[in-house]
Amino acid sequence: MGTYINRGNIEFCNIVRHEYVDKTSLIPLINATIDTESRYSCVTRCRRFGKSMAAKMLCAYYDKSCSSRELFRGLKAEQDPSFETYLNQYSVIYLDVTSFTARPELRKNLVRAMQDEIIYEMKEAFPDVRYKENSDLMDVLSSIYHGTGERFFFIIDEWDAICREFPERQKLKGDPDTVAPTILDE
């Protein structure tokens, strides 16, 4: 179980053991977008609405490093025809943006710090792949895909933390989908 890659299902297991309101109907909606032009999904809700729980649920469902069949037994997603097709079929990269924004030494070069952390772990997880020197994240993903056929499922939690944590850098007002790329470019 890695920090970013294939974290397993323990976090969702802990959630389900408590009083859990079944929100697994999100899974078939995401499944329907796999291998389509609409494969990039953004779940937006107000704060404290359960987005982090949903992210952990998606990690548990897609992560190939664990078996989550029993964890989802009796939940809504299990009834969907696509359930078995995608269950535990991907290497999942989970990124909680607040784990970076909370570290003052990383705030100046946030995107680079995120890439460096993920790249380091990916190279550890796939040591037999040949990588170009000074590879960025896209180069590393491409090298792994071409070397192994491995496909990745990215889950980015607290992506809007960039807008909350850097209000002084917001040049645009409005939707975080518009603001975040501008802040990331700085």
Predicted regions span which residues?
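Phosphate-binding site recognition
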Residues: 1-186
